[in-house]
């Protein structure tokens, strides 16, 4: 069985590892762009076609995007562990408890009304306790001590990237319906963000990952989730508009530096970051009939994503998630992986998700 462009279809385990590691790589590269020389890196070259870990000095550190993505994995793993043992569990409650443990790792305290979660394997890693410029709304939403729901979300006006940046793992769970993937993701987004565009962006991003993991071609999956975004009850118009713009812009392959920002936004809001990442992976994809190595597509897409500006770490992370889910871990450039901070932690969480979903490992 082959994937698009003649690339052999990856296994589910490879897609899970590829998605999580790809997101961490994009996050690390994007964070280096945001921080620049103050982070002890030179940052990507501004020359066209250049940009990657080859341009960095020292270890490439990922940010809060990857931290929260891994805690999303942990919450899902706990819920699936309960389910596999024959005990039903509230998935969103498991995710809330996981996020509360992340909150504590950042030196923040939840009010006494919030539960005190029991520690798990993920909590023993120093790299996940480092404070890496966490998104404000994630902190305030969790520190409220309230478990937000889709009917009563916390931070009702929050529409930043903190939802979409952590939502790839929902799309990695196999054998569940698309509407269930969307609900899991958007419900979890309600734990920290209340604005419809932030919650719907998270759900649509998870659906995109789900379709890719299920074997859909990249362009087909992108078109499908764009249509899904417009068909949602009480659909946020800005999400559909940004995604449609990303498809149009990628199709025209207009690579001028100003136009993507004008059309897609700066990338600081959830729907903008998703649209920019989608544009980056589509506009760098091989043309029909063209042979292209997956690792080159990954390099080109992530480099373009992080050059956009705005929340570069998030945009790079989303692009890395998408291509890792599409191609599996074979698309990840070996030199980039060698430079990545704590890949064993990312792999460890990927292994746990593989085990509870497939029984492997």
Label every PLM stretch briefly:
Residues 1-361:
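Structured, active/binding-site neighborhoods that engage oxygen-rich ligands
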């Amino acid at each position: 069985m082959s994937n698009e462009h003649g690339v052999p279809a990856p296994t589910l385990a490879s897609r899970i590892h590829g998605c999580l590691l790809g997101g961490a790589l994009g996050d690390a590269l994007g964070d280096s762009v945001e921080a620049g020389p103050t982070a002890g890196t030179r940052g990507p070259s501004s020359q066209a076609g250049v940009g990657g870990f080859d341009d960095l000095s020292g270890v490439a550190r990922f940010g809060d995007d990857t931290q929260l993505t891994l805690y999303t994995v942990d919450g899902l793993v706990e819920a699936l562990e309960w389910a596999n043992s024959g005990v039903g569990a509230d998935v969103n409650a498991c995710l809330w408890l996981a996020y509360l443990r992340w909150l504590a790792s950042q030196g923040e305290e939840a009010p006494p009304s919030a539960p005190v979660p029991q520690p798990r394997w993920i909590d023993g890693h120093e790299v996940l306790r480092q404070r890496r410029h966490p998104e404000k709304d994630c902190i305030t939403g969790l520190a409220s001590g309230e478990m937000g729901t889709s009917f009563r979300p916390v931070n009702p006006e929050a529409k930043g990237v903190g939802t979409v940046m952590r939502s790839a793992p929902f799309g990695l769970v196999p054998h569940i319906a698309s509407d269930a993937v969307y609900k899991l993701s958007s419900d979890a987004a309600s734990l920290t963000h209340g604005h419809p565009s932030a919650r719907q962006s998270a759900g649509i991003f998870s659906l995109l990952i789900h379709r890719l993991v299920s074997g859909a071609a990249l362009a087909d999956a992108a078109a499908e989730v764009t249509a899904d975004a417009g068909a949602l009850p009480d659909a946020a118009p800005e999400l559909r508009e940004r995604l449609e713009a990303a498809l149009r812009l990628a199709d025209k392959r207009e690579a001028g530096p100003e136009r993507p920002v004008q059309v897609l936004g700066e990338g600081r809001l959830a729907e903008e970051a998703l649209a920019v990442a989608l544009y980056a992976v589509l506009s760098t994809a091989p043309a029909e009939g063209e042979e292209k190595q997956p690792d080159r597509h990954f390099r080109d897409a992530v480099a373009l994503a992080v050059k956009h500006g705005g929340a570069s770490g998030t945009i790079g992370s989303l692009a890395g998630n998408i291509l890792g889910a599409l191609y599996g871990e074979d698309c990840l450039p070996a030199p980039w992986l060698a430079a990545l901070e704590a890949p064993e932690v990312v792999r460890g969480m990927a292994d746990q998700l593989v085990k509870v979903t497939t029984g492997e490992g």
